[in-house]
């Protein structure tokens, strides 16, 4: 049974078809990520993996040849658009296919919106999870007090008591139980902070 994500399977079919037709495949993503490694394996011809702006700027290809641009499903959507813009400015004969997972894009958009409104942001999930790392990067761009929370121990070591409003987001594979525990602990700690403040006032 093939349990590969349907979004990833779609990319496999795209790069196989386009590369058989003679296109040079450009994959925007992390070259070491298993998903990207798998996509490369479906390319029937030459391909290039692009992760950074410098990678895109350094890319050189004949103007009269076709390139097909796809992306890792969990890649930062805004960065994807920026990198594609670099290719378009080079006037290549480009076919651009947005292959970022819809749920990933929505989660990133929501996380960015929350991070803009809070004093601190907690990103809950595994440090080795690609989509969680992207969420952290996005939130950090909008809120300097952004923290990676993998376990409750990480939360205990963060100075969140000094922040008025705290936002929480989580990677797609993060268990709901962990998210709920982080939320509960944050709320409890905030209440404890208020209690201590009232004690200080009463004791003058």
Language-model regions: role of each:
Residues 1-204:
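The feature marks the mature, well-folded catalytic cores of soluble enzymes
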């Amino acid at each position: 049974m093939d349990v590969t994500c349907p979004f990833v399977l779609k990319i496999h079919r795209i790069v196989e078809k386009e590369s058989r037709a003679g296109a040079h495949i450009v994959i925007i993503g992390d070259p070491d990520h298993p998903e990207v490694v798998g996509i490369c394996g479906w390319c029937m011809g030459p391909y290039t993996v692009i992760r950074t702006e410098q990678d895109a700027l350094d890319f050189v290809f004949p103007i009269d040849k076709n390139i097909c641009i796809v992306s890792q499903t969990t890649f930062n959507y805004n960065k994807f658009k920026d990198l594609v813009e670099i290719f378009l400015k080079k006037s290549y004969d480009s076919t651009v296919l947005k292959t970022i997972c819809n749920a990933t894009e929505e989660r990133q958009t929501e996380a960015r919106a929350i991070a803009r409104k809070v004093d601190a942001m907690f990103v809950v999930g595994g440090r080795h999870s690609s989509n969680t790392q992207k969420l952290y990067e996005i939130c950090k761009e909008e809120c300097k007090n952004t923290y990676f929370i993998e376990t409750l121990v990480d939360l205990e070591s963060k100075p969140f008591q000094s922040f008025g409003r705290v936002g929480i987001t989580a990677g797609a594979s993060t268990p709901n139980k962990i998210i709920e525990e982080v939320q509960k602990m944050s709320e409890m700690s905030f209440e404890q902070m208020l209690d201590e403040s009232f004690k200080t006032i009463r004791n003058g």
